[in-house]
Amino acid sequence: MEDGGVERGGEKVLSDMGVAVFGYYSRMCFLCDVKHSAWPGRRGFLLAAAGSAATLATTPLLAQVDVGGSSSLRNLVPAEELEAASTQQYAKLLAEAKSQGALASAGNAQLQRLNVISRRLIPHAAQWNDRARQWRWEVNLIGSKQINAFCMPGGKIAFYTGILEQLQLTDDEVAMIMGHEMAHALREHARARIAKSQGTGTLLSLGAQLLGLGELGNVAANVGTELLTLRFSRDDESDADLVGLELAARGGYNPQAAVSLWQKMAKAGGGSSGPSFLSTHPSGPQRIQELQSNVPKVQGLYQRARS
């Protein structure tokens, strides 16, 4: 095993708090269509300060993908409070993972790989959210068989070792995932989703408690209300797909990798995405079709970045 590698011992499970928080963000993440397993007893890796949102040397081109404006509902939840709460919860998650032997080794090759990719994407983040200039970005690689990744508000990113090991991703494909997760934070999907749950009467008490926002309501969710929320979530996922595609292209990563990524994801998930109207995320074929149709729109950005 190389320095900073992973010990493969008996299984260990994170506390209910840790699993719940990761589960909450997984439900907002495009990767949760894929089957996953519990945390194994193994050492993970930590990468702190993945890079800063530096100003580009040249004036960036206008956005090439069409996703419209961010939801005005997000204004019901103060961005500063949500980002501060996320930073606090993120630190707790890292401490919990470390206590379970699932964290930290800056010298690992996979961690350095994520560092390189993040440094190429982060400078383009402010185009989608000016607050990103102030964020203290972090990227962590955590020992888990889960095929997943997420980005909390404020730029707190986590990758699971399972997604890198099981899918054998290229750098371009990793960039598509990272761009997608960054897009969730930049487009403030969590902020808007929490606000919408309050407005529609859907209770997200788990998210509220974990993010330190207090009670958002006392009405139990029913099937009808939940279906309304699912529609909103599917829109978020499509939005993040396209913004992430553009972020990765601007960073010099081949946009065609978004298609190959989802082909791998469909295979890993057994090809079962469920009925579209009940899914919290677009099905594999739907995603691939939409991404493929948008690849030409960002091809020029990719070529410019590579020149």
What residues fall within each predicted segment?
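A Zn2+-metalloprotease active-site environment signal
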Residues: 5-7, 13-307
